[in-house]
């Protein structure tokens, strides 16, 4: 665990996060995520998953699945190196150096080819590890996502000054609209059980309006306190009306 935490580099690739998913029944055949891990003799570890569907990946590969089906081949099960239900870049191979990581990945490729799996995928790989996959002939798929990065802004106005006039005007208008709704915000670092219950209600509603069940269980959120989570609630007329989860 200590080695894993030291080399993972972010909360979502950490042992604590992945283990919490496993221990709180977020990963099973019903969800389509079956947890596995390659522990190489050189000290490198690769957490990966046997996937029975493509749900919770945030990468849409249904066209590939249909193509496999048209040619009489099974696309599932497949193997995926990713963080379940979490589309963030991170280290997919946990090891001390690129040579060790490449050796471990080669072992996983061999395992895939010798088993019944259709393919091996690595999703949202951080930039520092992409060459390892390229050197082993992985096919790279490019897409776009959006991230906000704090470029040493001194204040919010300093951030706004970096935008063009149209975007700056629109953002100020949106913030003024929120102010006029008389919504207040509450930040909580010492999260209590009731806070998690309120948060999970909002989390569940987000899925329910789309006719889906939540990917994550309520017990999962209550088990990740060592990852330094922060909850922010929006209040209106003394009632919590929305919530957001952050990690430090």
Briefly describe each language-model feature range.
Residues 1-248:
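N-acyltransferase acceptor-side catalytic subdomain
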């Amino acid at each position: 665990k200590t080695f894993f935490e030291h080399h993972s580099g972010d909360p979502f690739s950490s042992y604590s996060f992945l283990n919490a998913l496993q221990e709180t029944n977020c990963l099973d055949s019903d969800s389509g995520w079956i947890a596995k891990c390659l522990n190489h003799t050189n000290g490198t570890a690769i957490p990966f998953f046997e996937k029975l569907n493509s749900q919770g990946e945030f990468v849409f590969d249904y066209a590939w699945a249909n193509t496999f089906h048209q040619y009489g081949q099974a696309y599932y099960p497949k193997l995926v190196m990713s963080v379940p239900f979490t589309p963030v870049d991170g280290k997919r191979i946990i090891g001390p150096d690129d040579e060790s990581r490449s050796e471990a990945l080669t072992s996983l490729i061999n395992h895939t080819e010798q088993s019944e799996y259709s393919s091996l995928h690595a999703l949202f790989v951080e930039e520092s590890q992409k060459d390892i996959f390229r050197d082993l002939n992985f096919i790279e798929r490019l897409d776009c996502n959006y991230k906000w990065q704090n470029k040493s802004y001194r204040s919010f106005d300093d951030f706004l000054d970096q935008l063009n006039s149209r975007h700056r005007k629109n953002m100020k208008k949106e913030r003024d609209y929120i102010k006029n709704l008389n919504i207040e915000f509450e930040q909580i670092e010492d999260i209590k059980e009731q806070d998690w219950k309120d948060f999970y209600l909002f989390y569940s509603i987000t899925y329910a309006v789309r006719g889906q069940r939540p990917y994550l269980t309520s017990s999962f959120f209550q088990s990740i306190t060592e990852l330094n989570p922060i909850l922010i609630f929006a209040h209106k007329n003394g009632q919590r009306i929305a919530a957001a989860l952050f990690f430090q």
